[in-house]
Regions:
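Helix-start/capping segments and mature chain N-termini
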Residues: 1-117, 138, 145-354
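Extended, Lys/Arg-enriched charged tracts that mediate electrostatic binding to polyanionic substrates
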Residues: 126-136, 140
Length: 354
């Protein structure tokens, strides 16, 4: 794929790491590529970061024809830059496109686009411990009509944001609350797709949890309101009597790349792993009896976020004395070591941008 590159005439500078939050600072450039039913994907380009123009009737603004991904670029100790399993993100992006009726991308072209814009803005990849360059690929429908039909015009874009360390004071466990009113998704819906509507619709429950003193919610299935599905924006895992249990991918849960990586790591260590239905009753019985030894959320942003307490109605149980568990810490250390290039990568997960 031929990508034209137009560089900015007013380059910015990477702020100090202690001034980096998440998603508030953006690099100098972005990638754009357009789609039309008659031309297919065309006009791949890296251009200066700036506003995007579209018709007020664009389908994304009215019917939510949008999907996105979240991934990172990491600065290695030798100064090089690498990605972590980017082909998994590209595959998931295409699955999301299929579900939302959006045009899919050639996987090689999508990866080339990501690597190219990261390479152009390579000087924006921070090097301090725990920092990274967050990558947000997204794809949206631009048909200039209010007619409700499949997408005939679209844009694929990639923007970049240098991000600070998620845990500035170490891995501090957080309390989470079982959500009993709202549901995130149902089988046959868009729960397995990474689309904006899933996240926007979750805000109300997240706000309620924070008002009650919790960090985020723990979602239950949308039919029986009985089975644990995932955290507010991440997958979840529980160590129960020595076995790591994580909700099965039933079609309403996001297929997390970090989740998949953790399962492969755990199995390589000989740790029993079960992907299955886990009822909230079973989970809280395990918490009450002490069988629940560790719990953590898992995803791209935090990698591992230990759960220190579980709330459900009038019940609230502390987990592992509100401390990060040994296995949670080991997973975090191994995953981040591979991502930042401080540990060997026996799985072939990393992808240099060169």
């Amino acid at each position: 794929m031929n990508i034209t590159i137009t560089k900015t005439t007013h380059p910015g500078t990477l702020p100090p790491s202690d001034q980096l939050g998440f998603g508030t600072v953006f690099t100098d450039h972005m990638f754009l590529m357009d789609y039309s039913a008659d031309k297919g994907w065309h006009d791949a380009r890296v251009v200066p970061y700036g506003p995007i123009t579209m018709s007020p009737a664009a389908s994304v603004l009215h019917y939510g024809t949008e999907v996105f991904e979240g991934m990172k670029a990491y600065r290695r100790p030798d100064g090089g830059v690498q990605l972590f399993r980017p082909w998994e993100n590209v595959a998931r992006l295409n699955r999301s496109c299929e579900r939302l009726g959006l045009p899919q991308l050639d996987p090689d072209d999508a990866l080339q686009a990501i690597k190219t814009v990261v390479k152009v803005d390579e000087n924006w990849v921070p090097s301090d411990p725990g920092t990274s360059l967050y990558i947000r690929p997204f794809l949206y429908g631009t048909d200039p009509t209010l007619a409700l039909h499949g997408v005939h015009e679209a844009t694929f874009a990639v923007i970049l944001s240098p991000s600070g360390s998620y845990f500035k004071n170490g891995l501090q466990p957080v309390p989470i609350m079982v959500e009993t009113e709202d549901v995130r998704a149902v089988r046959g819906g868009t729960g397995e797709a990474k689309c904006g509507g899933n996240y926007g619709a979750a805000n109300r429950a997240g706000d309620r949890a924070i008002e009650k003193g919790f960090s985020q919610v723990l979602w239950l299935d949308g039919v029986e309101r009985k089975y644990v599905e995932e955290g507010g924006g991440m997958n979840v895992m529980f160590k129960i009597n020595g076995t790591v249990v994580t909700p099965a991918l039933t079609g309403s849960i996001l297929r997390g790349v970090t989740r998949k990586s953790a399962i492969e790591l755990l199995k390589s260590w000989g740790v029993p792993v079960e992907e299955r239905l886990l009822s909230v009753d079973e989970l809280f019985d395990a918490a009450a009896s002490g069988a629940l030894e560790e719990a953590w959320c898992i995803g791209t942003a935090a990698v591992i976020s230990p759960i220190g307490a579980l709330g459900w109605g009038d019940k609230c149980y502390e987990i592992n004395h509100n401390r990060i568990g040994e296995l949670s810490q080991k997973l975090y250390d191994e995953l981040t070591g591979i991502q930042w290039g401080t540990k060997p990568d026996p799985f072939g997960w990393v992808c240099p941008i060169d």
